Every structure is written in C-alpha cells, then in structure tokens.
UniProtKB/Swiss-Prot annotation:
Name under which the protein is recorded: 4-hydroxyphenylpyruvate dioxygenase
Function noted in UniProt: Key enzyme in the degradation of tyrosine.
Catalytic activity: 3-(4-hydroxyphenyl)pyruvate + O2 = homogentisate + CO2
Gene behind the chain: hpd-1
Record organism: Caenorhabditis briggsae
InterPro entries for the chain: 4OHPhenylPyrv_dOase (IPR005956), 4OHPhenylPyrv_dOase_C (IPR041735), 4OHPhenylPyrv_dOase_N (IPR041736), Glyas_Bleomycin-R_OHBP_Dase (IPR029068), Glyas_Fos-R_dOase_dom (IPR004360), VOC (IPR037523)
GO CC terms in record: endoplasmic reticulum membrane; Golgi membrane
UniProt-listed PANTHER family: 4-HYDROXYPHENYLPYRUVATE DIOXYGENASE
Similarity comment: family membership: Belongs to the 4HPPD family.
Chain sites annotated for binding Fe cation: H182, H267, E350
Top-rank lineage group of the source organism: Eukaryota
UniProt keywords, alphabetically: Dioxygenase, Iron, Metal-binding, Oxidoreductase, Phenylalanine catabolism, Repeat, Tyrosine catabolism
Domain called VOC: residue spans: 17-148, 179-339
Length: 393
C-alpha cells in the first residue's frame, strides 16, 4: 500500500466537492422510489412532462449532502439514453462536481486534450442561474462541472419540488448517511493507468493511495487500485483494474466490465457517523449486504488483541451485522457492501464510517473478495470462457 503527497496547488480553479450523481435507468420514477425505500433517501426535486421537460424525466433524491438523480427517456426515439441502457443497463452516467472558476478549469481541460461533451452553458430560472460543462472520462462516464454561485433553487434550473410526499418514507427507520465518501471506477485490464493519467492531466488530481495485486488477491482473483483526488482531497476517485490469477478465475472487476460492457462506476461509498445504527436501519428496510464468515472476526479479534488500537463499537454487533473493520496505528474504518442494486452484477453501494483513518479497507479486500466470489459462484460467474453462455474455462 502506497500513499502520496498532494504537491503544489494547481493553478486552475477549484473542484470543491461531489455535487450529485446522475444515473441512466429504464424507469426513473421506480428507481428513485427503490433507493428511497431501501437506502433512506427522500425525493426532493423533479423534472418531467409536468415541468415542461419533453425529452427525459429526472427524479432527484437526497439524504443530507448526498444527491442522486435518476433519468429515463420519455420518447421511444431517444437513441442516446436507449443505447446507453441497452449497453450498460441501469448505472451511473455522470458524477457531477461542484467547482469554482469553471472557465479556467475548462480552458485547461481543452488544452490538455479532454473530450468536451458539452461546452460551458448557462441555464436560468426564477431562482437564478448556474453554469456548467461536461467532460468525458473513462468509458461512457461523464463529469459535469457545475458552478452554482448564488443559485437559490432547491436543486437546478428546470427542476420543481418533487410531487411525491415523503410521508411514507418518514415511517421507516432513519438511516443517517451524510455525504459521498468516494466513487469507484472499474477498468478493463491495463486500462487503470490511462484513466488515472486522465485525472492527473485533465483535472490536475493527484495520487492519494494505491495497492497492487501482490497485496490484494485471493486464491482465485486479484486487483490493482489507484485512488486519485483533488488538491483539497474532498473528491476521491479510486480506479480499479483486474489482475490475472493462477486459477484463471473471473475477477469481480472483470465480471463488472463484462456485464457493464466496459469501464464504469462500480460502487459509490456513502459516509455515516454511526454505521451500526445505519446498517440496522438499512437491513430493516430490506437492504441486502454481503455476508462475512465468522473466521474473519476470529482473526480480527486476535489482531486487535495485540494492537494498541481500540475499537469503540461492540464487536459482537459488528459481527452480527457483517460489518468489516480495517485499522492501523492511527485509527480505523468500518465498512459494508451491498449486493448489486440491479439484476446485472454491476453497481453496488458501500457504507463507511471513518475514525481517523483515510484508507480504503485494504486489510478487508481479501475477505471482501472471498465474499463476492461466493456470490459469483451462485451466479455461475467465477469461471467462464464466454459471459453469454457461462461455460467454464
């Protein structure tokens, strides 16, 4: 595991934070409802036929500082969204960043050779105006750079308050997720380095953390990962690629690439200050999470017994909830991973709590991989020659 220094502050504008994540889905209304019911979000903004949007419908949901937007086509000839949906299934299309000094960021991106999906545009309504531009990153994933300034609306121009009353969601256990911690992108083999270089060259990100397959492997599969971040280290983007194994198994990273149809967002990590309460609430709502064997907790207790690090949370409750623990001499983190959020084994969510620990759970990768490999076995996907027929290698 390697960590990096942030270096000098770039001489372009500031990428402030994650603003929102936009999904392309088959039915935005149903997808938004599912994430609200399962993960504790509430609908707050809407754009569709009733608001004058004739092309797509968008449902925006939020939980504290986390905002997800689900978009689907309204007309049958929308080839842009239709082709994306056929190729990738429901998934993340755009990870939007709030920025300051949009002009200088876009000017640098153009000079560095970025693909500009949409040049600087201004949109306005009665609440003010916002300016934005959209860049293409890995695969068909985009980053919209959004400059809000003094916009006073609930979300963005063109959106109106969501028509669905949140009364039902208030009757469910409160979850308590606070902000988007990091957003992970999976790449085909040998495509991690070009993706990382894109962030370094186009957005002036720096490397924050990395591991390779000598550390992260099981009997069957392995991965390599590099985390890139902005200068302020408020936006963290881990980039993964599969690594081959002696067993010739299909890594979870390769499985994602095969079913997503290329590079894309594998998972979104959501931060909480009380993961035990959050997971108890999420399980009560019907969320499904990966199962961790009891042997993991036996080993964890043994390692903690000879460490100066003390975990404040009750270990029996962590084990009952299948929450993973990683620690070093400075602090620890607690994390858990959902099962895929759609039929394709692609996007899932992570819930994470940090106690003076800025890593990404390297000590848990082996247990996590083994748990995912059990799920791959159930799907018939741990060994296959061709993803379409599932025949074993």
């Amino acid at each position: 595991m390697t960590t990096f220094d942030r270096g000098e502050k770039p001489d372009i504008g500031t990428l402030v934070a994650f603003d929102h994540v936009r999904f392309v889905v088959g039915n935005a209304k149903q997808a938004a409802y599912w994430y609200c019911a399962n993960f504790g979000f509430e609908p707050f903004a809407y754009k569709g036929l009733e608001t004058g949007s004739r092309i797509t419908a968008q449902h925006a949901i939020k939980q504290d500082k986390i905002v997800f937007v689900f978009e689907s086509a309204l007309l049958p000839d929308n080839t842009e969204l239709g082709e994306h949906l056929v190729q990738h299934g429901d998934g993340v299309k755009d990870v939007c960043f709030e920025v300051e000094d949009l002009d200088s960021i876009v000017a640098h991106a153009k000079a560095a050779g970025a693909t500009i999906v949409r040049d600087i545009t201004e949109e306005s309504d009665e609440n003010g105006s916002v300016r934005f531009a959209t860049l293409r990153t890995y695969g068909e994933t985009d980053h919209t750079l959004l400059e809000r300034k003094k916009y006073k609306g609930a979300f963005l121009p063109g959106f109106k308050p969501h028509p669905m009353p949140p009364t039902f969601f208030h009757s469910l256990p409160r979850v308590g997720l606070n902000f988007l911690d990091h957003c992970v992108g999976n790449q085909p083999d040998l495509q991690m380095a070009p993706a990382v270089e894109w962030y370094e060259n186009i957005l002036k990100f720096h490397r924050f953390w990395s591991v390779d397959d000598s550390m992260i492997h099981t009997e069957y599969s392995a991965l390599r990962s590099i985390v890139v971040t902005n200068f302020e280290e408020t936006i963290k983007m881990p980039i993964n690629e599969p690594a081959s194994s002696n067993k010739k198994a299909v890594s979870q990273i390769q499985e994602f690439v095969d079913y997503y149809g290329g590079s894309g967002v594998q998972h979104i990590a959501l931060n909480t200050t009380d993961i035990i309460t959050a997971i108890e609430a999420l399980r009560a709502r019907g969320c499904e999470f990966l199962s961790i064997p009891s042997s993991y907790y036996d080993n964890l207790r043994q390692r903690l017994s000879v460490s100066s690090m003390k975990i404040k949370e009750d270990m029996d409750r962590l084990q009952k909830l299948h929450i993973l623990v990683d620690f070093d001499e400075n602090g620890y983190l607690l994390q858990i991973f959902s099962k895929p959020c759609q039929d394709r084994p692609t996007l899932f969510l992570e819930i994470i709590q940090r106690q003076n620990h800025q890593g990404f759970g390297a000590g848990n990768f082996k247990a996590l991989f083994e748990s995912i490999e059990l799920e791959q076995t159930k799907r018939g996907n741990l060994f296959y020659e061709n993803v379409k027929d599932g025949q074993h290698k």
